[in-house]
Regions:
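Acidic, glycine/polar-enriched metal-coordinating patches/loops
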Residues: 1-72
Length: 72
């Protein structure tokens, strides 16, 4: 896997980037009370989009954020 810069959205339905955080694969970051997990870009990358894993109330929801990742 790669390290990437991941821009987190304002909220789950909003793909606009308001911050960029250096993020390693399979590690968590907490943003506005929501935990996000990086996946392997080689398997999750689709048309310059990346899937982040959101953990909320014991269920996982896949969210597609467009144009928010960059190779380091």
């Amino acid at each position: 896997g790669k390290n990437v810069l991941v821009g987190l959205p304002r909220n789950p339905q909003d793909g606009r980037v308001i911050t960029v955080i250096p993020k390693a694969e399979n590690t968590w970051v907490n943003f506005n009370g929501v935990n996000y997990m990086r996946y392997n870009s080689s398997t999750r990358e689709v048309n310059n989009s990346i899937y982040l894993k959101r953990y909320e109330t014991r269920k996982y929801v896949y969210e597609k954020m467009s144009n928010v990742w960059f190779e380091i």
